Regions:
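Residue-level recognition of well-ordered beta-strand positions that form the cores
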Residues: 49-51, 73, 217-221
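A short hydrophobic beta-strand element
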Residues: 48, 70-72, 103
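Bacterial N-terminal signal peptides that target proteins for export
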Residues: 1-9
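Short, solvent-exposed loop/hinge segments that bridge or flank secondary-structure elements
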Residues: 25-68, 185-196
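Bacterial N-terminal signal peptides
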Residues: 8-17
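Carbohydrate-interacting regions of secretory-pathway proteins
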Residues: 22-25, 79-252
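A common structural microfeature
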Residues: 45, 57-59, 69, 211-217, ...
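N-terminal glycine/threonine-rich, aromatic-flanked beta-hairpin/loop signature
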Residues: 52-96
Length: 252
């Protein structure tokens, strides 16, 4: 009988920005939330969840586009994997005006999928997307408040969803490939003594042991690169048995 091994990889990698829709070389990038100059938009980008007054649940994903520009994707029913109907989206363009962060509906005219110019950016390939409506809103103090096309009010609060396995301890007899103290289990790579992260420096690294039957636990971080688009915002991954890639991207 072939024995099944349990492989736990506690890998916290800073992911390189590359691939399609690559960012310009001078696009600013942050790799720590503690950076002194990280823009306030990092606290605005994210997922929001709430209720339409007299209606159902609604979610939103707010995308920072650089500077004071944003786009909100409103999702009827809730967030992806947690209530969204999987079909309909409502796009709102956002920018700072008179000290507030205001959002208004877009009809899709002049828009293009993942365009670099925030005024032309669309998070959806189809413009306008299915279910698009004339919503409006404002973000303040972690809340997205606004009105639907028929005048109903809504309020969404910023939420941070986490995996139930985040921070999971390795099972008994698991092989820990990386825990922030040593890179001995890898051929190549660099251990950053300050951050305790395993860095690939843009090169492939491989495990010393050749493994083929396992369960993998991976933890990772993404850079913050709001001026970039598509995979340029953060793109990396790892290969299982040197063949099947698990790609890790900025989910927005």
């Amino acid at each position: 009988m072939k024995m099944k091994s349990i492989l736990t990889l506690l890998l916290t990698s800073l992911l390189a920005a590359s691939g399609l829709h690559a960012a310009k070389k001078n696009t600013p990038v942050w790799t720590s939330l503690d950076a002194a100059n990280i823009p306030v938009s990092v606290k605005i980008q994210g997922e929001y969840l709430g209720q339409i007054n007299g209606g159902g649940k609604i979610g939103a994903q707010v995308i920072a586009l650089g500077g004071d520009n944003y786009q909100a994707v409103m999702l009827p029913g809730g967030l992806p994997g947690a209530g969204w109907d999987g079909k309909n989206k409502i796009l709102l363009d956002g920018s700072k005006k008179d000290g507030g962060l205001l959002f208004h509906s877009t009809n899709g005219k002049g828009k293009g999928y993942l365009q670099e110019d925030p005024a032309r950016f669309s998070a959806t390939r189809k413009n306008p997307p299915n279910g698009n409506k004339a919503y409006s809103g404002v973000i303040s103090e972690g809340a997205l408040q606004g009105k639907t096309d028929d005048g109903k009010s809504f309020e969404l609060r910023r939420v941070i969803r986490t995996s139930p396995t985040l921070g999971m301890k390795p099972p008994k007899d698991a092989k820990v490939l990386f825990d922030g103290t040593s890179k001995a289990a890898f051929q190549g790579g660099r251990l950053d003594e300050k951050t305790k992260l395993l860095n690939t420096d843009g090169r492939d690294i491989r495990t010393v042991d050749k493994l083929s039957n396992y369960q993998m636990h991976v933890e990772f971080m993404l850079p913050y690169r709001p001026d970039a688009r598509g995979q340029g915002r953060g793109n990396s991954g790892f290969y299982q048995v040197d063949m099947y890639e698990v790609q890790i991207l900025d989910s927005f």
